[in-house]
């Protein structure tokens, strides 16, 4: 079997609760055991993965770590080098939206435009326009 370089995308991956973190950990470990090179590309909160699996962190604002407006505002204001996507993420959250999938998809698409040396990309529920662009290339 040909050994592949595989990217697994996960917009939010709490390592101990819920299904996403468990799924990403299990599939990345299984693919690594099969001999493939695996990178997990994730937004916060980040995974605890097997040592042989590379974790690439795509930091977002992680505004859902708190539900306090003051703390969310502080997170946003303390972010250095704000981009348009950060303003969108903050304002959408402010009005009750859940923009993490969309903003992660945008960041992942930008990352994979530069780092396009993967044989396969597996997305774990990001469901965003960025994923449509990634799908065209992989």
Regions found by a protein language model. Give the residues of each.
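An aromatic- and histidine-rich active-site surface loop
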Residues: 94-109, 120-138
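N-terminal subdomain of nucleotide-sugar transferases
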Residues: 1-61, 113-116
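Intrinsic-disorder/low-complexity, polar/charged segments
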Residues: 18, 80-83, 125, 136
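A conserved catalytic-core segment of Leloir-type glycosyltransferases
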Residues: 42-107
């Amino acid at each position: 079997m040909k050994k592949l370089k595989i990217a697994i995308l996960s917009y939010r991956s709490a390592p101990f609760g819920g299904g996403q973190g468990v799924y990403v950990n299990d599939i990345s470990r299984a693919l690594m055991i099969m001999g493939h090179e695996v990178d997990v590309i994730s937004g916060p909160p980040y995974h605890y993965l097997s040592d042989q699996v590379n974790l690439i962190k795509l930091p977002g604002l992680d505004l859902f770590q708190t539900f306090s407006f003051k703390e969310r505002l502080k997170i946003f204001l303390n972010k250095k080098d704000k981009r348009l996507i950060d303003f969108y993420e903050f304002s959408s959250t402010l009005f009750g939206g859940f923009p993490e999938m969309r903003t992660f998809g945008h960041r992942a698409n930008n990352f994979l435009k530069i780092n396009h040396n993967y044989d396969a990309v597996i997305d774990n529920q990001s469901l965003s326009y960025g994923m449509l662009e990634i799908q065209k290339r992989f």
